[in-house]
Regions:
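Polyanion-binding surfaces on beta-sheet-dominated domains and ring/shell assemblies
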Residues: 1-129
Length: 129
């Protein structure tokens, strides 16, 4: 069989760099199309589109796509979501104070909207490639 390891090295981190790396690396899905056409794999291993966004509570407000300054003061970090609306990773750090249930619900809703927007862009790019 074939093993594919996808690695993203972040040379200079700033705000949502980690989440951007996760989303950008998904573009390697094009590799699987090529392997399918060449008969090297029988089935596309990609189970779902996914994307990652940074989010956090800054100054009592839920924010999406944090810059470095916001990220350094935020109460939460990131969400990786799927096309079907599932969450494959959620990082929360209540470093300055705990995140409330209301804030968490608001962050998840905000993040899912951001993930859906990124996935729509991924689909468009992959369809045009």
């Amino acid at each position: 069989g074939i093993s594919v390891n996808i690695d993203a090295d972040v040379i200079e981190a700033d705000g949502g760099t980690r989440t951007a790396s996760i989303t950008v690396v998904f573009g390697d899905a094009l590799l699987f199309r090529k392997l399918l056409r060449e008969g090297k794999i029988a089935k596309n291993p990609v189970q779902s589109y996914l994307a990652a966004v940074s989010c956090g509570v800054v100054g009592g407000r839920p924010l999406l796509d944090l810059c470095y300054q916001e990220d350094s003061h935020a109460e939460a970090n990131e969400l990786v979501g799927t096309e079907q609306g599932g969450v494959s990773e959620l990082q929360i750090s209540g470093e300055k104070r705990p995140v409330t249930d209301e804030e968490l619900a608001s962050l998840i809703s905000l993040c899912k909207a951001g993930v859906a927007e990124l996935i729509a862009m991924e689909k468009k790019i992959l369809e045009e490639a």
